[in-house]
Amino acid sequence: VESKLDSSPVTVADKLAEEKMREIIMKEFPTHGIIGEEFGSDNPDAEYVWVLDPIDGTKSFISGALSFGTLIALLKNGKPIIGVINHPILNEFLIGDNQNCLLNGSKVEIRNCSSINQATLLTTDHLNIGKYQNQNKFDELTKKVKLYRNWGDCYGYYLLATGFADIMIDPIMNVWDSMALIPIINGAGGMITDYQGNDPTIGNSIVASSKGIHSEVIKLLYE
């Protein structure tokens, strides 16, 4: 395990996995671009660009937890059109195209939650909330929901898309963290924005939820 400049961990597995993914993509789609967490950008202005996070949840991976996964997005002219979350140990493969979302080939949808006081709220790391966003507002949200847990990284979005949670929040995100999530959450019938309620493709944070409560969540977090 090594540390990046931001002190986040990176493993040999992260690097080897991304190298293999890049090799496959360049063989099959030589004109496509690639943006990866470990090795940066290659032809990022191409019409089609793959965005790769070989191990999302590296801290979980090095701890032996099973909730880590791989994130893959395909962008067309800068917009994500396909997103994948793969949990290899859990044998769960989630794919979305903004219209539908499939888990191991079967359609899944976000559950219909119309009231925040009935919602399950997830986030990746509560310590990052106050560092990047408004801690007091987040604390108020946690008091209003039915259940709050730190089940994060891509596993939190998997739980949201498959109907086991209602709100997933990350106060800071990189492009390789967020792009795959957008077609998945949209395809599962949810809503996904940044912390301010804007286009998540141009923001650096994520708020994803059931459509019925999204505007209220944004209001509580930001306004």
Regions found by a protein language model. Give the residues of each.
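N-terminal subdomain of lithium-sensitive/metallo-dependent phosphomonoesterases centered on the IMPase/IPPase/PAP
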Residues: V1-I55, D199, G212, E216-E223
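Short glycine/threonine-rich catalytic loop with a Thr-x-Gly-x-Asp
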Residues: D14, F61-G64, R149
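Residue-level signal for inorganic ion chemistry
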Residues: D14, I25, T58, H87, ...
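Generic detector of well-ordered alpha-helical packing
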Residues: K15, E38, P54-G57, P88, ...
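DPxDG-like acidic metal-binding loop motif
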Residues: P44-Q99
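Short strand-turn-strand beta-turns centered on an Asx-Gly dipeptide
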Residues: N77, N104-G105
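An extended, acidic
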Residues: E109-E223
